[in-house]
Structures are given as structure tokens and as C-alpha cells.
Regions:
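Active-site proximal loop and beta-alpha junction motif in alpha/beta enzyme cores
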Residues: 1-70, 76-284
Length: 284
């Protein structure tokens, strides 16, 4: 069985967010998918299986800890690889069926790689935190809040607590404790700290062990929140930054359409192509 290593939200190879893509994982069990993700040590891996409809694939995304119902950069990276393997012409369109959501992705060849853009649909705006609760979350990251803006839970498939912090607060941020229960209590799965003026953000897994380089599932909520706050207009693309503090600067292109759908896109570079030696049956 073959798999590929790609870089997403990357203007060149060895930048952006790395990803392992298995283009035909039809014979793998969920247990094998989870174990392979742990073996490869990527923040996320994506496993595809072709469906009967043209350019349609089932997709399952795993972190080293669990399966996710939705993710951003794995979807874009997978679509770019599908274009490389099956697209042929300069432009293509794909439909990925995740466990709880279907996502349409447009891809095109660009420079030495690909550009992929997905429609995440409309954002769902959740709980707005009061001052005390927002301060508690900021303290959990040893960060300083930007009190000009509200902290709010927003989702385009995964619910994020969007926590505005100062520029210095973003640079100094370090998650000090597990936030699983605290986030669940407000209807969020992750926290995303953002320097509003710089359009830059950071996020960690709920345990605070691993910082993500570029988070497409957070980019949609951030874009929708910014438009709702009047910081950016609808129907006008803009870029978000992430990964600088990990030495992997990444650009995430976003746009909220007049209808309210959120588009998230970025460049994808193919890095490596490999083959598993055990058979799927040997992997369990």
C-alpha cells in the first residue's frame, strides 16, 4: 500500500503543515489507521477510499490520539494529491465524504505544486464567554487577552474557542494544563489564540502537548468571526498566518461569501512517496 507526504498551506516544500495521505485505504481497519498515524507522527493523517461517483472519495482523518469528524489541511492535501494522481488537466473538483460532513474541494496546478480550496459552508456561532471565563482561558496559556474583542466558540465542522490575545500574549503563549473538560464545558473542542491585528494565530491539542502548524479547520471559524466583527468585509479574500513560532510559516487564504459560506484554501506541495511493506491484513 502506497502513501504520500505532502506540505499544506506551503509556498515551498518543507514549509506549511505536513500530512500523510493514503490515497486508497479501502482495506485498512480503523485500528490500523490510528496506529499508522501514531507511527508516522504527523499532526494528522488522512485515509481515502474511492466511491462509485466520479471524483468522490470517503475520507477519515486521525490525529495521534483520535479520529476527527472534520479537519482542514488534510482535506486540502488529499485533494491536491488526488489531482496529481487522477486530475490530469489544470483544474479539477473533488467531493470528500467525511463521517459527519461532505466537503467540495476545487484544485488547480500552480507553480511547482497545487492550489486547493474547500467550501466549509456557513459558520455556526456558539457561546460568547464572559470576562471572567475568557480571563481563565488566557491564564491557562500564560497569555494576555486583547479586551477589545469577545472570546467566542465558532465552528465550521470543529468547534473552536476563538480567544483574542495581544501580540506579546501570542508570542508568549504556552498551554499549561489539559483543557479537555473546560473546553467541553463551553461546547468547544480546541482553543485558537489569535492576534487580531496581525491576523495570526496558534493552537494546540487539548492536552497542550503538540502545537499545530497550520489549522484549516480553525481558519474558517476565524474568517467568519472576523467578518461578523466588522474587521474584514464579506466577498473579499484575505490571508491568515500561522506556524511562525514553529519555524514553519504558513499562509491560509480565506473568504466569506455574500451567502455566508466560508472558503479556505492554500498551496500544497508534494514531498515524498512511500510504500508500506506489511499487507493490510498484517496491520490488524
Amino acid at each position: 500500500m502506497e502513501y504520500w507526504q505532502v506540505d499544506v498551506f506551503a509556498e515551498r516544500v518543507l514549509s506549511g503543515n505536513g500530512l500523510a495521505v493514503f490515497p486508497d485505504a479501502s482495506e485498512l481497519t480503523a485500528t490500523a489507521m490510528q496506529e499508522l498515524t501514531r507511527e508516522l507522527r504527523q499532526f494528522e493523517s488522512i485515509f481515502l477510499a474511492p466511491l462509485d461517483a466520479p471524483n468522490a472519495f470517503s475520507a477519515r482523518v486521525f490525529t495521534v490520539e483520535e479520529e476527527l469528524p472534520f479537519a482542514g489541511h488534510p482535506i486540502l492535501g488529499a485533494a491536491a494529491l488526488l489531482h496529481h494522481l487522477h486530475g490530469g488537466k489544470s483544474d479539477a473538483s473533488w467531493l470528500l465524504h467525511l463521517p459527519e460532513k461532505q466537503v467540495r474541494i476545487a484544485t488547480r496546478r500552480q507553480n511547482k505544486g497545487f492550489y486547493a480550496e474547500m467550501d466549509q459552508g456557513p459558520a455556526v456561532f456558539g457561546k460568547v464567554l464572559d470576562e471572567a471565563a475568557a480571563d481563565t482561558f488566557a491564564a491557562a496559556f500564560s497569555s494576555e487577552r486583547d479586551r477589545r474583542y469577545p472570546a467566542q466558540v465558532v465552528s465550521n465542522g470543529l468547534p473552536y474557542l476563538l480567544l483574542p490575545v495581544t501580540s506579546g500574549g501570542l508570542a508568549a503563549a504556552k498551554q499549561r494544563e489539559s483543557l479537555d473538560d473546560a473546553l467541553a464545558g463551553i461546547g468547544a473542542a480546541f482553543a485558537f489564540l489569535m492576534d487580531v491585528d496581525a491576523r495570526e494565530g496558534r493552537t494546540w491539542d487539548p492536552l497542550g502537548v503538540v502545537e499545530d502548524i497550520a489549522t484549516g479547520s480553525a481558519a474558517g471559524p476565524v474568517a467568519a468571526w472576523r467578518v461578523a466583527q466588522g474587521l474584514d468585509p464579506a466577498d473579499k479574500p484575505f490571508a491568515l498566518a500561522q506556524g511562525r513560532f514553529l519555524g514553519r510559516p504558513s499562509r491560509l487564504d480565506v473568504c466569506v461569501t455574500a451567502a455566508g459560506n466560508v472558503l479556505v484554501g492554500g498551496e500544497v506541495q508534494l514531498l515524498a512517496h512511500a510504500r508500506l511493506l506489511p499487507t493490510p491484513a498484517d496491520l490488524g
